[in-house]
């Protein structure tokens, strides 16, 4: 234990090397007439401590620091009437034993409110890694316990991140097929009968289109609040293919026109487009 001679004036002093972890603060202002006493047994009370130090001077006040539960932290402060009595105790600190236990005695120092900048303090200094009784790890640093939560693997959502309204509007999206058929209607004839035929349309002419209601597939689409839509997965549906037919008269090709709306779907409008058939008579 190394001790320094102290002057009565309350001037800042250099750090006092103390081996006990319950030692006095290392930086601050020395409090006159007061000493720090560490290594106190938890069974020792203030009256016992006063009686012991009264042998070396006139004791004014004795204070043992306790925790919130009232249990002694193992250190306290003794204030003497004069600085000379406190100085004498500091000089004889190595010789003082209480109940066969060596006391850790040093000057009483009041901590400075504005001390060393935080940037100059190493974060790892004074950090303790502990574990609770239930097995949760935490770090204790500067009087604050920091609990570490385990990492949770995030599961990506099955849909895009954009929000979808709680009551989506269903819009029917028609998917239809328009197969084209090229045909030539020919009839057998006997001698003496007329022969007639329907000419085959050329490649440049518009093909005949057949569209039946069974070929229309409706897929619901959800409309989001932000104006975007989330398309459902594409599903393939088997559709019936109409059989081509021929007529000897005038045929009309029907185109089914759709006017999709975000609210309702009107009935399909049938617009007939007459196509003329060219007749040829051979003798």
From Swiss-Prot:
<keyword id="KW-0810">Translation regulation</keyword>
<feature type="domain" description="RRM">
    <location>
        <begin position="33"/>
        <end position="110"/>
    </location>
</feature>
<protein>
    <recommendedName>
        <fullName>Protein boule-like</fullName>
    </recommendedName>
</protein>
<keyword id="KW-0963">Cytoplasm</keyword>
<comment type="function">
    <text>Probable RNA-binding protein, which may be required during spermatogenesis. May act by binding to the 3'-UTR of mRNAs and regulating their translation.</text>
</comment>
<feature type="domain" description="DAZ">
    <location>
        <begin position="160"/>
        <end position="184"/>
    </location>
</feature>
<dbReference type="GO" id="GO:0070935">
    <property type="term" value="P:3'-UTR-mediated mRNA stabilization"/>
</dbReference>
<dbReference type="GO" id="GO:0030154">
    <property type="term" value="P:cell differentiation"/>
</dbReference>
<keyword id="KW-0694">RNA-binding</keyword>
<dbReference type="GO" id="GO:0045948">
    <property type="term" value="P:positive regulation of translational initiation"/>
</dbReference>
<dbReference type="InterPro" id="IPR043628">
    <property type="entry name" value="DAZ_dom"/>
</dbReference>
<keyword id="KW-0221">Differentiation</keyword>
<dbReference type="InterPro" id="IPR035979">
    <property type="entry name" value="RBD_domain_sf"/>
</dbReference>
<dbReference type="InterPro" id="IPR000504">
    <property type="entry name" value="RRM_dom"/>
</dbReference>
<dbReference type="InterPro" id="IPR012677">
    <property type="entry name" value="Nucleotide-bd_a/b_plait_sf"/>
</dbReference>
<dbReference type="GO" id="GO:0007283">
    <property type="term" value="P:spermatogenesis"/>
</dbReference>
<dbReference type="GO" id="GO:0003730">
    <property type="term" value="F:mRNA 3'-UTR binding"/>
</dbReference>
<keyword id="KW-0217">Developmental protein</keyword>
<dbReference type="Pfam" id="PF00076">
    <property type="entry name" value="RRM_1"/>
</dbReference>
<dbReference type="GO" id="GO:0005737">
    <property type="term" value="C:cytoplasm"/>
</dbReference>
<dbReference type="GO" id="GO:0008494">
    <property type="term" value="F:translation activator activity"/>
</dbReference>
<dbReference type="GO" id="GO:0042802">
    <property type="term" value="F:identical protein binding"/>
</dbReference>
<comment type="similarity">
    <text>Belongs to the RRM DAZ family.</text>
</comment>
<feature type="region of interest" description="Disordered">
    <location>
        <begin position="1"/>
        <end position="25"/>
    </location>
</feature>
<comment type="subunit">
    <text>Interacts with DAZ1 and DAZL.</text>
</comment>
<keyword id="KW-0744">Spermatogenesis</keyword>
<dbReference type="GO" id="GO:0051321">
    <property type="term" value="P:meiotic cell cycle"/>
</dbReference>
């Amino acid at each position: 234990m190394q001790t320094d001679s102290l002057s009565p004036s309350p001037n800042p002093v250099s750090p006092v090397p103390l081996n006990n972890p319950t030692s006095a603060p290392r930086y601050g202002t020395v409090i006159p007439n007061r000493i720090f006493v560490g290594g106190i047994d938890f069974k020792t009370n203030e009256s016992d401590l006063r009686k012991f130090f009264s042998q070396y001077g006139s004791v004014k006040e004795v204070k043992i620091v306790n925790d919130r539960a009232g249990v002694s932290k193992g250190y306290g402060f003794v204030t003497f009437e004069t600085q000379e009595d406190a100085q004498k105790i500091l000089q004889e600190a190595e010789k003082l034993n209480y109940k066969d236990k060596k006391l850790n005695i040093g000057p009483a120092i009041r901590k400075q409110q504005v001390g060393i900048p935080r940037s100059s303090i190493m974060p790892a200094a004074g950090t303790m890694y502990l574990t609770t009784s239930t097995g949760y790890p935490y770090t204790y640093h500067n009087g604050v316990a920091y609990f570490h939560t385990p990492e949770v693997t995030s599961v990506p959502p099955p849909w895009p991140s954009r929000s979808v309204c709680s009551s989506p509007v269903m819009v029917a999206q028609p998917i239809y097929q328009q197969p084209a058929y090229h045909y030539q209607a020919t009839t057998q004839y006997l001698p003496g009968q007329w022969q007639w035929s329907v000419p085959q349309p050329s490649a440049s002419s518009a093909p005949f289109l057949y569209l039946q209601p069974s070929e229309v597939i409706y897929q619901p689409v959800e409309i989001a609040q932000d104006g975007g839509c989330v398309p459902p997965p594409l599903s393939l549906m088997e559709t019936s293919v109409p059989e081509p037919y021929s007529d000897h008269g005038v045929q009309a090709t029907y185109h089914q026109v759709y006017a999709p709306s975000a609210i309702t779907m009107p009935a399909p409008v049938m617009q007939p487009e007459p196509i003329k058939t060219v007749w040829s008579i051979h003798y």
